Amino acid sequence: MVKFTIDQIRGLMEYQNNIRNMSVIAHVDHGKSTLTDSLVAAAGIIAFEQAGDQRLTDTRADEQERGITIKSTGISLYYQMTDEQLKGFTGERQGNDFLINLIDSPGHVDFSSEVTAALRITDGALVVVDCIEGVCVQTETVLRQALGERIRPVLTINKIDRCFLELMLDPEEAYLAYRRVIENANVIMATYADEHLGDTQTHPEAGTVSFSAGLHGWAFTLTVFANMYAAKFGTDTKRMMEKLWGDNFFDATTRKWTKKHTGADTCKRGFCQFIYEPIKTVIEAAMNDNKDKLFDLLKKLNVYSKLKPEDRELMGKPLMKRVMQTWLPAHEALLEMMIWHLPSPAKAQKYRVDVLYEGPLDDTYATAVRNCDADGPLMMYVSKMIPAADKGRFYAFGRVFSGRIATGRKVRIMGPNYVPGQKKDLYVKTVQRTVLCMGRRQEAVEDVPCGNTVALVGLDQFITKNATLTDEKCEDAHTIKAMKFSVSPVVRVAVEPKVASDLPKLVEGLKRLAKSDPMVQCTIEETGEHIIAGAGELHLEICLKDLQDDFMGGAEIRVSEPVVSFRETVIGTSDHVVMSKSPNKHNRLYMQARPMEDGLAEAIDEGKIGPRDDPKVRSKILSEEFGWDKELAKKILAFGPDTTGPNMVTDITKGVQYLNEIKDSVVAAFQWASKEGVLAEENMRGIVFEVCDVVLHADAIHRGGGQIIPTARRSMYAAQLTAQPRLLEPVYLVEIQCPEQAMGGVYSVLNQKRGMVFEELQRPGTPIFNLKAYLPVIESFGFTSTLRAATAGQAFPQCVFDHWEAMGSDPTQVGSQANTLVMDIRKRKGLKPEPAALSEYEDKL
């Protein structure tokens, strides 16, 4: 039943207007993979009978077992539209054949870095929302990410079969439930809207909302019904669609449409009367095996003739599933919606180039990307590495933005740390093969033009997680911007092999793990431990399983207890200016520390303010939003740690000699100090260090880096200690769904774990409550299992990293909670148990 060949797909790749790159995004368990199945079935990769049960895009064994998607998987679909379907289509197109590159992404929050990787290489998104659960926390996160990447969303309200079979909703109740979901989604879209995208809100009457039942493989948009009724009412499809949603009522006796309900029994809302009721009648007739009534209805709908003779013999649910699939096939409604309302690469790259390209927006590369020019220079972004079947090699998966990539072509690989004009993070290598991803298998093609997704073989030695590829001659090309992840790796474990001789395997395995997951961080501590950092418990569990089974060939490893990263900050200004002398006693540095204004550290994290900004723009933001003095805002020497972190060092000195010569040394000391704070050698966050005065030796030889760097670091530590230092701990935002009777259990578990509930909502029309709470990450281990035990498995938690919270107790006071934590961290790192006293860092005149 395969309906297309690889050559057909390859031919379509040249027609940019006929390509749609889209990802499927949603909250966990709202039915993305199941819905993707019916789309894949349309392209003839699996049989319709199995659609909904296969979850073809869940390619790993653990994904099939757990029933969750872990990695995002790409698949290319070929779809032929009829002239009838394209009647009013105004966009540009070449012929009726369309190529849809679809990426199914995970919904679970621990894997949201996979979603980011998927969004970067697509132009449109199908947002799936469960009609009963509504818009959840993860729906909001992925929508925000999509709009940030300038990706146009369309909405589908999924699992509507539950309205008919489980909940037995009245038509009016169902309409209100759907309307509420659409309103909630539109609020999010309006909040994070980007003016370059135009209006991103979705409306059923515009055809940008569909209603689907993924498991049963049927779906519809208002267009389907409007076409059916337009002839009967003697109007055109567009006017009919407006009548089928919103406050439009039809009275069957007077045969008139009104805007208000007349009060007569025969007067009903358009949506309820012409869409919900007919579906309900068909489903009920099929479920009750009332075949005479059912087949009469189907003959009126011109569906009866499409049913195969053996299908007419089915009973109950299988009959209902088959009838609905024949009448309202899911792929037609959804693919039609994507083709009509999602942009082609030629259209999307015009407005996406600003958020994609690092360099000047008028050079040859930006222009080629903007015009999606197949004859221009090659620009390709690799957003993730996919392990091949034998686990040893990786495919580099990404999207070609301009030019074309071919087998045997030499390319320049520019990693995330590449700076134009330097040799760092730069390789020139040959592509061995270009392949297309088809879910579980790969198909080789000769070359791929821009606007398409592709996987490359033979570059895995040179790309860690992501990279930009160009032609080998393009030496002035800039990279495509790095991805911003919405979660940060805050949970860490140390790993070691059980048998010491397996150490080389572990090191090699960690290298491969770092490639295969866009977010995980693998580092070696000074103590020689191997550390893996991930987004949460589940993320780490999957990473460790991959490491042991796939990347180390089953060699056994020991894993430490999970450890949480902390940050160090200050909550007051230094009570006096501290002074440190250099080892040769010829130079003195005076410094003080103060906390950043609220929201400034977050702004730096999000990249709104950074070291590469235009100083004028930066000082404007700092003075207007955070109340900085305009002069002071121009005197920021550096951000740190890693030159981009949420701390800064500023220069408030007046007329000091030789200051410029020691600037580099002070900045180097600041990077060192902000990476390892004074309390427990954790990163600092939200501290501004001010250089108040400097007294230097007149002779250059006596004020070299060896004298200044340790001195500056000591004075920063002293400044931190005098400004009321505090520990910051990471806090999760937890969303819990549970029925009313389980609420008591939820509250008691949260109280034991220092959690704090700040919102509780009952879902209208259901007995289910939605709780939102803050929970410290350090308390979250085993939280899920404790919660399920306390509520007999009725509560479902979702944790996502939210913010850093200062701990109330003073870490310098012996016996306080923070002090105990500091001692534990220092013991683990092999430092002296007591943090050093102020007198070690501060000198007297």
UniProtKB/Swiss-Prot annotation:
UniProt modified residues of type Phosphothreonine: T57, T59
Enzyme Commission code: 3.6.5.-
Entry-annotated residues carrying Diphthamide: H702
Protein localization: Cytoplasm
Organism per entry: Parachlorella kessleri
CDD domains, A to Z: aeEF2_snRNP_like_IV (cd01681), eEF2_snRNP_like_C (cd04096), EF2 (cd01885), EF2_II (cd16268), EF2_snRNP_III (cd16261)
rRNA-binding is among the record's keywords: no
A GO term for molecular function: GTP binding
Function: Catalyzes the GTP-dependent ribosomal translocation step during translation elongation. During this step, the ribosome changes from the pre-translocational (PRE) to the post-translocational (POST) state as the newly formed A-site-bound peptidyl-tRNA and P-site-bound deacylated tRNA move to the P and E sites, respectively. Catalyzes the coordinated movement of the two tRNA molecules, the mRNA and conformational changes in the ribosome.
Keywords for the protein's UniProt record, in alphabetical order: Cytoplasm, Elongation factor, GTP-binding, Hydrolase, Nucleotide-binding, Phosphoprotein, Protein biosynthesis
PANTHER family: EUKARYOTIC TRANSLATION ELONGATION FACTOR 2, TRANSLATION ELONGATION FACTOR-RELATED
Pfam families with a match to the protein in the record: EFG_C, EFG_III, EFG_IV, GTP_EFTU, GTP_EFTU_D2
Protein's UniProt name: Elongation factor 2
Enzyme class: hydrolase
Modified how: Phosphorylation by EF-2 kinase completely inactivates EF-2.
Residue ranges annotated for the tr-type G domain, each copy included: 17-346
Native organism taxonomy: Eukaryota, Viridiplantae, Chlorophyta, core chlorophytes, Trebouxiophyceae
GO CC annotation terms, alphabetical: cytosol; ribonucleoprotein complex
InterPro entries attached to this UniProt entry: EFG_II, EFG_III/V, EFG_V-like, EFTu-like_2, G_TR_CS, P-loop_NTPase, Ribosomal_Su5_D2-typ_SF, Ribsml_uS5_D2-typ_fold_subgr
Stated family: Belongs to the TRAFAC class translation factor GTPase superfamily. Classic translation factor GTPase family. EF-G/EF-2 subfamily.
Binding site for GTP: A26, H27, V28, D29, H30, G31, K32, S33, N158, K159, I160, D161
Catalytically driven reaction(s): GTP + H2O = GDP + phosphate + H(+)
